[in-house]
Structure formats: structure tokens, C-alpha cells
From Swiss-Prot:
The gene is rutB. Disulfide bonds: none annotated. HAMAP family: RutB. InterPro entries: Isochorismatase-like_dom, Isochorismatase-like_hydrls, Isochorismatase-like_sf, RutB. Its EC number is 3.5.1.110. GO terms for molecular function: hydrolase activity, acting on carbon-nitrogen (but not peptide) bonds, in linear amides. Belongs to the isochorismatase family. RutB subfamily. GO terms for biological process: nitrogen utilization; uracil catabolic process. Keywords: Hydrolase. This is Ureidoacrylate amidohydrolase RutB. It catalyses: (Z)-3-ureidoacrylate + H2O + H(+) = (Z)-3-aminoacrylate + NH4(+) + CO2; (Z)-3-ureidoacrylate + H2O = (Z)-3-aminoacrylate + carbamate + H(+); (Z)-2-methylureidoacrylate + H2O + H(+) = (Z)-2-methylaminoacrylate + NH4(+) + CO2. It is an enzyme of class 3 (hydrolase).
């Protein structure tokens, strides 16, 4: 998967030199034109009090700094001409897309389990069109940003994501969002198997569960599937030449 060098037989100049992003376990060379910033599931469900994760018993009290860091990364990406892609996770209001008892998703989704335990929440959690499904107010997509709906943990499953990337010559995916140990890691892993280079900006992600879940996910990514960097390093690397981030 490479960026097109010709269109209708006409050579296209490569105007964007590769940048070296500081990362673990080693720096990674990336071209802005082959890179996308991916914002995973920054919805009220995952980042707001009263959202699904909060109602299911997960701590979302420290998501504020993550939202601020994602905003910073988005601004840097847009300034560098890097596309920003938002995922929204959820299902139709009747939950047909969630699957029934024959689907493992029906048994493992904490949103579905919470609604079965608390019938008064039926139809509220992760239902398209509802408050829970909406992106948080602080992370409103801007003109030119892309929003991709998804119905499972991995953003590659039954979505337009891979097509969106391939049609733009994207091969580097820089991940932010919630939850590091669930949808972020699932999508990055699937990208690895599809030959995408995946990087997580650790301080722009948040786990579902205790802190060790965050550290375990970052360990898995750094050791087996990709790279780990930071928002400041991303912003500095892709700042306009000659300008500070």
C-alpha cells in the first residue's frame, strides 16, 4: 500500500519529506501525507459522567486532560495537513447491530449487560442519535475531518475505515482516545495485520478499568504491534518547518 505517484500518467511530486517521530521502542519515520490521526470513541458514553462507562462502574473522572491533549493533537494534525478521523461506536436504537444471544458481543458488551441489569436504561446506552452516542462537545469534528461509525471494538470491522485509508494512501495511524485496552488496541492490532504502522499517543488515551490496564495495553503495543509516543512529540514532529509546536 503506497501513496500514488502518478495520476492519469502524470507524475506527482513528493513534496513532503518524512519526519522522525520520537517513540518507543524506536523512532518512526512518517510522511504527513501518509499519516492519519485517529480519535477513537470520544463519546459521552466513554468520557462523560452519566455515560455508559460511568454507569457501568468504570472511573471516567480523569478523562479531562485526555480530551485536552486530543484537541492539541487534532490542531497539530490539521495544521500539518494530516487527516483527522473520528470513530463513533454504537448501534441502531433497536440494537439489531449489537447482535443477539448468538453473538459474543451480546454477552461481553458491558453496555448491553448494564442495560439488562437496569431496564430503565434500555435504549439509552450507545444508541445512535442519543446523547450517549454523541462525541463530547469539546471534540467537535471540523470541516475536512472524517467520521466513521463502527459497531464493534475494532474500527476495521464492517466499516469504511480501510477504504477511507487506502483511497488516501494512508499507511501510518496515530491513535488517541478511549479505551486504550479495548477499542484503541483492537483497532491498532487489526491495522498491524493489514500492514498499517500504528502509533499510540499515550497521554491522549485512557483505559477502561484500573491503571494497570493502561500500562498492559501500552506494553503490548510497544512490544508486539506498534509504537508509543506522546502528544508533545507528535506536535513538535509535525509542526510547520521552522515554527515551534
Amino acid at each position: 500500500m503506497t501513496t500514488p505517484t502518478t495520476v492519469a500518467g502524470v507524475d506527482l511530486p513528493d513534496l513532503q519529506p518524512a519526519r522522525e517521530l520520537p517513540a518507543r521502542p524506536e523512532p518512526l519515520r512518517m510522511k504527513p501525507g501518509e499519516t492519519a490521526l485517529v480519535v477513537v470513541d470520544m463519546q459521552n458514553a466513554y468520557a462523560s459522567l452519566g455515560g455508559y462507562l460511568d454507569l457501568a462502574g468504570f472511573d471516567v473522572s480523569s478523562t479531562g486532560p485526555v480530551i485536552a491533549n486530543i484537541n492539541k493533537a487534532c490542531a497539530a494534525a490539521r495544521a500539518a495537513g494530516i487527516p483527522v478521523i473520528f470513530f463513533q461506536n454504537g448501534w441502531d436504537p433497536a440494537y439489531v447491530e449489537a447482535g443477539g444471544p448468538g453473538s459474543p458481543n451480546w454477552h461481553k458488551s458491558n453496555a448491553l449487560k448494564t442495560m439488562r441489569k437496569r431496564p430503565e436504561l434500555e435504549g439509552q446506552l450507545l444508541a445512535k442519535g442519543g446523547w450517549d452516542y454523541q462525541l463530547v462537545d469539546e471534540l467537535t469534528p471540523q470541516p475536512g475531518d472524517i467520521v466513521v461509525p463502527k459497531i464493534r471494538y475494532s474500527g476495521f470491522f464492517n466499516s469504511s475505515f480501510d477504504s477511507v485509508l487506502r483511497s488516501r494512501g494512508i499507511r501510518n495511524l496515530v491513535f488517541t482516545g478511549i479505551a486504550t485496552n479495548v477499542c484503541v488496541e483492537s483497532t491498532l492490532r487489526d491495522g498491524f495485520h493489514l500492514e498499517y504502522f500504528g502509533v499510540v499517543l499515550a497521554d491522549a488515551t485512557h483505559q477502561a478499568g484500573p491503571e494497570f490496564a493502561q500500562q498492559a495495553a501500552l506494553f503490548n503495543i510497544e512490544t508486539f504491534f506498534g509504537w508509543v509516543s506522546s502528544v508533545d512529540d507528535f506536535c513538535t514532529t509535525f509542526s510547520p518547518v521552522g515554527q515551534p509546536s
